[in-house]
Regions:
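Loop/turn elements at helix/coil->beta-strand transitions in domains of secreted/extracellular proteins
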Residues: 46-51, 78-82, 110-115, 145, ...
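Bacterial N-terminal signal peptides that target proteins for export
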Residues: 1-10
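Structural microenvironment flanking redox-active thiols in thiol-disulfide oxidoreductases
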Residues: 62-127
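Bacterial N-terminal signal peptides
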Residues: 9-19
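Boundary at the C-terminal end of the N-terminal hydrophobic targeting segment
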Residues: 20-24
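A short beta-strand-turn-helix
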Residues: 29-50, 73-76
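Thiol-/selenol-based redox modules, centered on thioredoxin-like
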Residues: 129-187
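Amphipathic alpha-helical repeat scaffolds
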Residues: 55-59
Length: 187
């Protein structure tokens, strides 16, 4: 048997191996809108958009970032961008309120209109599945409130920024604009 025929047989064997199932889509998960009763599928609701996923808190030094996050949402929303907020009490109890209290605070204090979802854990053994997936994709867990993960239109995590990076940071804004230039996937 020649090397060439061995290579051809090896290639044919590989070509007939069934394709391994794709990893679950990052957003193929259900979460309740903040203070809501019915969970929604994030992929059905937000899939195909460029997303900035942020763990939030109402009693944190970074809480004023809500204003900048809302500004991003307003500036780029019509182009297929959304901020997704996930309140968390994981860091020094800085989100102690009920979901109704959080919603009222965000709306009245910062005029938040971007989608906010149920209160979740973003670190530790009770980390919610979305944050497990974000961490697996980047190798980075939130170190504090207002950690930001940027998700492309096709559901890939393409960047993450720590809490100290403000929503209007030039590098973050450039990354959002770069992702918005990519065509939306066919749904």
């Amino acid at each position: 048997m020649t090397f060439k025929s061995l290579f051809v047989k090896w290639f044919l064997v590989l070509a007939t191996v069934p394709e391994v199932a794709a990893a679950p889509a990052l957003l193929d998960l259900e979460y309740r809108p903040l203070a809501g009763k019915t969970a929604v599928n994030l992929n059905e609701q937000q899939g195909g958009k460029v997303l900035l996923v942020v763990n939030t808190a109402s009693k944190c030094g970074y809480t004023p970032q809500y204003e900048g996050l809302e500004a991003l949402h307003q500036r780029y929303g019509a182009r297929g961008f959304a901020v997704l907020g996930f309140p968390s009490n994981d860091f020094r109890g800085q989100e102690p309120g009920s979901e109704e209290q959080i919603q009222e605070f965000c709306t009245l204090t910062y005029g938040v209109k971007f989608p906010m979802y149920e209160k979740v854990h973003v670190t530790g053994p009770e980390t919610t599945e979305l944050y497990r997936r974000l961490q697996a994709a980047t190798g980075v867990a939130p170190g504090w409130n207002f950690h930001k993960y940027l998700v492309s239109r096709d559901g890939r995590v393409v960047g993450n920024w720590p809490s100290k990076v403000k929503p209007d940071d030039p590098a973050l804004v450039a990354a959002i604009e770069r992702e918005l230039k990519a065509p939306a996937p066919k749904r």
